[in-house]
């Protein structure tokens, strides 16, 4: 519905869009995230498509607007507040990307990055392709594969400067998903909650088996939110043995570092 206010055409829908874009810009600024002037508008279009597609398929359980902005876009971009985590011009893979977090916001914020978004469900990749088309994104490639299977592809294995995941999985499982994709001398980065402290022992053992070493978790505070995430880098020190990752489903059922089975 379009209304005439003071001789000017006013669309309530346009007003809501402007408020959302302003909220995105405000939250990025409050969190100290570096961004270009066009990023809030790009994130807004992403947000609109996410809401549209979420009505017909399960992409996110978080639907309250302020919470979506913080949990999806801001949380994904908090890695940019720590410059050494994602170097200029890096190749980056987001394993199990789902609706694109954290990899797609990072790609939108950093045109210098070469980003691969990998997921096991084609319908999620169809959504992501719609976002890429709508925004004419040129620095993102989509790959349809499970984490364990993708890491056995010659063109994917140990080819990336950074591998990331925001999946809800124990640290030893994430290590087995991510480290096989990472070049020696580079890193994986896991988005984790405070409960990761209980996973560090097994996580260190798993990382060692996979050629990696855990660094100290980095707290990233999002103002006004009770929940907080930690960013946990894992340095890739040596090549990952050929038997890793194990066959699809095994890392989750029998995590490294928590069992004698390898």
Question: Could you tell me what each predicted segment is?
Answer:
Residues 182-184:
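Helix-to-beta-strand junctions that scaffold the AdoMet/dcAdoMet cofactor pocket
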Residues 50, 106, 192, 234:
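Residue-level signal for inorganic ion chemistry
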Residues 124-126, 196, 200:
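Short alpha-helix immediately C-terminal to the canonical SAM-binding loop
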Residues 161-173, 180, 190, 194:
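A short SAM/SAH-binding and catalytic strip from SAM-dependent methyltransferases
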Residues 2-5, 9-89, 93, 123-140:
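Class I SAM-dependent transferase core
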